[in-house]
Curated annotation (Swiss-Prot):
Active site: 580 (proton donor/acceptor)
Biased composition (Polar residues): 36-49
Residue numbers binding Zn(2+): 349, 352, 487
GO molecular function: metallopeptidase activity; zinc ion binding
PROSITE patterns: CARBOXYPEPT_ZN_1, CARBOXYPEPT_ZN_2, FA58C_1, FA58C_3, PEPTIDASE_M14
Entry-linked PANTHER family: CARBOXYPEPTIDASE X1-RELATED, PROTEASE M14 CARBOXYPEPTIDASE
Name of the protein: Probable carboxypeptidase X1
Highest taxon of the lineage: Eukaryota
Species for this entry: Mus musculus (Mouse)
Residue span(s) of domain Peptidase M14: 287-610
Glycosylation sites: 49, 200, 210, 307, 461
Keywords: Carboxypeptidase, Disulfide bond, Glycoprotein, Hydrolase, Metal-binding, Metalloprotease, Protease, Secreted, Signal, Zinc
Length: 722
């Protein structure tokens, strides 16, 4: 967000600020624009620009610079990407702007859904799926056009005066508009210029005009996806705002996705205005943190709570930024026997910023509440070792942060600096397991757990991001039991498998052997998340996950080969789900207090699930030392876990009666019944293993034949019996 504010401040002399703004021989009109019948601006003859590739947009902008230099009467267009309003019929006039601008107004809430469907109206719509309620910034369409979930508001073709209207419910100070075109894989629809109207009663309207009294035509989009911001030359106090498309892409339709920037104004009838502000008793830091600010905040938490925190790095990004982790425990830096390890990972996709801020808020909250003596937090930190990785992809985040919350779009910053999607970059162990299962090799020949990395994945020329390798080494170094991967752009919890078992299937229900546990974990988070439990909320984009409790099998949503969830399950002991936290990938700072309240209890409750099921220590019966890498198998579940280096283990299970087996190389297998109840805390299930005669003999031979006296006498008696 600060990237947006800095950009707007820097461009304050300009009326508008937009990335990928259109360029044409007539100011403000995109190449190939179609004029609305009532427009008084002549149609340009420039060939349509039908691509949104960045290098093409930059080339067009450079052309615009050349044109502007030739037109001496026009003001300099400003920095790259600056969108400027157009004054029809008076191209030589210069628009004089007031010195005071209001770039800091937050979004009204079309993208975050704070603006309800009932607050959006339009002059017409091509279909219900293209209605006014779909005119929200960054809204995504379904795979098929023409259904109930298309990717924009689109007016009817015969509508000669189309408009999209937003009701703010109360008077606000409108300061700017962000627009996009239609999200579709089949259509090319976007508005290239528009006018703006305001009203207090939806009956009497006035337009945004320049100092000479002429209507301002704002330049809009030159592609469907790049957000373009236009600031009003003079902020307007009103309740309603209308966007009136004037021109649109040639051969397309007037289609819009939008966000409105507006500042609240004082209401003389509101006696308690402070009651509408969501505060925090813990003085938490509700703002977006770039790399430097994140590091500073983590250091402050560590200094406030040095006895329960430790900061460490698991590696570096491609750009050299460290992947910092905050460890929180009563004995930081130490694995305590019998204490489970749990992690939260955020920022795998750099533009999905909410998870990063929630983890920074969580570490502040845990520190404050521990110092305050909160019993729930105290117990959590004394019985669990927590690891928080707020930014797995810091390079991508810095890109998104620089663009700002409203201009980052849907995908910019998602990938690493190398262009790698980290959630498709882990080794595909699913195919390896499923082929072995089809050949009847599991579990006798091929294990059903801790599958090794494929050879191709470790080759020097393998396309594996340094961020991915850092997390893999982290997974192998610490015996994690439970994890959640925090994403954004939806409101749902997805669980493994993420990859479909049928090759090339786009989606297919593909459960793990631990499907009951994963559904439990997912339901726990979804059931304690306030936004997911809001029965009145509308779907974010094209699927209504509330019909199924806001949880879904990942592969049944869309296949994701090489996901971190699947890799964690098949390569380590750790069970991991993906939490999609919000419809808005990069919510404005104004939204952070509410998002924290939506997720606070869910984050804590999910951490507490690490103590469900059974736990224990597998020891050598003679020495009583823990046995590392012993295999814990549960009858009826074709997925095993192993013990840590001290012999301790944790096996997540839902309530029920289980037959559990412990085995280790050189030891007799031991089996026992373990009953998991709904009582709080794990059920202890310890094992004592006895070495096999073969193992004893191997150890004796290792002592160069020097047998103990008792064993020597037994051997002599056996020889005498012969």
């Amino acid at each position: 967000m600060w990237g947006l504010l800095l950009a707007v401040t820097a461009f304050a002399p300009s009326v508008g600020l937009g990335l990928g703004a259109p360029s044409a021989s007539v100011p403000g009109l995109a190449p190939g624009s179609t004029l609305a019948p009532h427009s008084s601006v002549a149609q340009p003859s420039t060939k349509a620009n039908e691509t949104s590739e960045r290098h093409v947009r930059l080339r067009v902008i450079k052309k615009k610079k050349i044109v502007v230099k030739k037109r001496k009467k026009l003001r300099h267009p400003g920095p790259l990407g600056t969108a400027r309003p157009v004054v029809p019929t008076h191209p030589a006039k210069t628009l004089t702007l007031p010195e005071k601008q209001e770039p800091g107004c937050p979004p009204l809430g079309l993208e975050s859904l704070r603006v309800s469907d009932s607050q959006l109206e339009a002059s017409s719509s091509q279909s219900f799926g293209l209605g006014a309620h779909r005119g929200r910034l960054n809204i995504q369409s379904g795979l098929e056009d023409g259904d109930l979930y298309d990717g924009a508001w689109c007016a009817e073709q015969q509508d000669t005066e189309p408009w999209l209207q937003v009701d703010a419910k109360n008077p606000v100070r409108f300061a700017g508009i962000v627009t996009q075109g239609r999200n579709s894989v089949w259509r090319y629809d976007w508005v290239t210029s528009f006018k703006v109207q305001f009203s207090n009663d939806s009956q009497t309207w006035w337009k945004s005009r320049n100092s000479t009294g002429m209507d301002i035509v704002f330049p809009a989009n030159s592609d469907a996806e790049t957000p373009v911001l236009n600031l009003l030359p003079e902020p307007q106090v009103a309740r309603f705002i209308r966007l009136l498309p004037q021109t649109w892409f040639q051969g397309g339709a007037p289609c819009l996705r939008a966000e409105i920037l507006a500042c609240p104004v004082s209401d003389p009838n509101d006696l308690f205005p402070e009651a509408h502000t969501l505060g925090s008793s813990n003085s938490l830091d509700f703002r977006h943190h770039n790399y430097k600010a994140m590091r500073k905040l983590m250091k402050q938490v560590n200094e406030q709570c040095p006895n329960i925190t430790r900061i460490y790095s698991i590696g570096k990004s491609h750009q050299g930024l460290k992947l910092y982790v905050m460890e929180m425990s009563d004995h930081p830096g130490e694995h305590e026997l019998g204490e489970p390890e749990v992690r939260y990972v955020a920022g795998m996709h750099g533009n999905e910023a909410l998870g990063r801020e929630l983890l920074l808020l969580l570490m502040q909250f845990l520190c404050h509440e521990f110092l305050r003596g909160d019993p729930r937090v105290t117990r959590l930190l004394t019985e669990t070792r927590i690891h928080l990785l707020p930014s797995m992809n810091p390079d991508g985040y810095e890109t998104a942060y620089h663009r700002g919350s409203e201009l980052v779009g849907w995908a910019e910053g998602r990938w690493t600096h190398q262009g790698i999607d980290l959630n498709h970059n882990f080794a595909d162990l699913n195919t390896q397991l499923w082929y072995a299962e089809d050949d009847g090799l599991v579990p006798d020949t091929v294990p059903n757990h801790h599958l090794p990395l494929p050879t191709y994945y470790t080759l020097p020329n393998a396309t594996v991001a340094p961020e991915t390798w850092a997390v893999i080494k982290w997974m192998k170094r610490i015996p994690f039991v439970l994890s959640a991967n925090l994403h954004g752009g939806e409101l749902v919890v997805s669980y493994p498998f993420d990859m479909t078992r049928t090759p090339w299937a786009a989606r297919e229900l593909t459960p793990t052997p631990d499907d009951a546990v994963f559904r439990w974990l997912s339901t726990v988070y979804a059931g304690t998340n306030r936004a997911m439990q809001d029965t009145d909320r509308r779907p974010c984009h094209s699927q209504d996950f509330s019909l199924h409790g806001n949880v879904i099998n990942g592969a049944d949503w869309h296949t994701v080969p090489g996901s971190m969830n699947d890799f964690s399950y098949l390569h380590t002991n750790c069970f991991e789900v993906t939490v999609e936290l919000s419809c808005d990938k990069f919510p404005h700072e104004k939204e952070l207090p509410q998002e924290w309240e939506n997720n606070k209890d869910a984050l804590l409750t999910y951490l507490e699930q690490v103590r469900m099921g059974i736990t224990g220590v597998v020891r050598d019966k003679d020495t009583e030392l823990g046995i590392a890498d012993a295999v814990i198998a549960v009858e009826g579940i074709n997925h095993d876990v192993t013990t840590a280096w001290g012999g301790d283990y944790w096996r997540l299970l839902t309530p029920g009666d289980y037959v559990v087996t412990a085995s280790a190389e050189g030891y007799h297998t031991v089996r026992q019944h373990c009953q998991v109840t709904f009582e709080e805390g794990p059920v202890p299930c310890n094992f004592l293993l006895t070495k096999t005669p073969k193992e004893r003999l191997r150890e004796l031979l290792a002592t160069r034949g020097k047998l103990p006296p008792d064993l020597r006498r037994k051997l002599e008696r056996l020889r005498g019996q012969k």
